[in-house]
């Protein structure tokens, strides 16, 4: 039974998305339908969590908007409404859930960039 479920889910999973992890700064291009208009809305911020597996996987992106108001948005990872995901920076973190960033403001909310040797693969 599990093999049947896994094979059906495999059809709906996307393979065109780049690998990213919590702490990375990403720009998600999300298709928004307003009335009859369809437009692509970019949302840029830090990934504070990834959860789930298979087609149910989601990730949450946090950014600080105008006047210091934090905005978090949760996206289904395999949604057909996601046009593309750009990884802008790889953050150096030691946690899977970065909820502590909610209490931090300004420079305290910055994350160090994860460095890597030239030519190596970065997860």
UniProtKB/Swiss-Prot annotation:
GO terms for molecular function: structural constituent of ribosome. InterPro entries: Ribosomal_bL19 (IPR001857), Ribosomal_bL19_CS (IPR018257), Ribosomal_bL19_sf (IPR038657), Translation_prot_SH3-like_sf (IPR008991). Keywords: Ribonucleoprotein, Ribosomal protein. Disulfide bonds: none annotated. It holds the Pfam family Ribosomal_L19. It comes from Thermomicrobium roseum (strain ATCC 27502 / DSM 5159 / P-2). GO terms for cellular component: cytosolic large ribosomal subunit. This is Large ribosomal subunit protein bL19. It comes from the Bacteria. This protein is located at the 30S-50S ribosomal subunit interface and may play a role in the structure and function of the aminoacyl-tRNA binding site. PROSITE patterns: RIBOSOMAL_L19 (PS01015). Belongs to the bacterial ribosomal protein bL19 family. GO terms for biological process: translation.
């Amino acid at each position: 039974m599990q093999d049947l479920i896994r094979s059906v889910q495999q059809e709906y999973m996307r393979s065109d998305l780049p690998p990213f992890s919590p702490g990375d700064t990403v720009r998600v291009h999300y298709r928004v339908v307003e009335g009859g208009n369809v437009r692509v809305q970019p949302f840029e911020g830090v990934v504070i969590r990834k959860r789930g597996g298979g087609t149910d996987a989601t990730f949450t992106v946090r950014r600080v908007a105008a006047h210091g108001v934090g905005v978090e948005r949760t996206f289904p990872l395999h949604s057909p409404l996601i046009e593309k995901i750009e990884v802008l920076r790889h953050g150096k973190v030691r946690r899977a859930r970065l909820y502590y960033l909610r209490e931090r403001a300004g420079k305290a909310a910055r994350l160090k960039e994860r460095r890597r040797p030239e030519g190596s693969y970065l997860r």
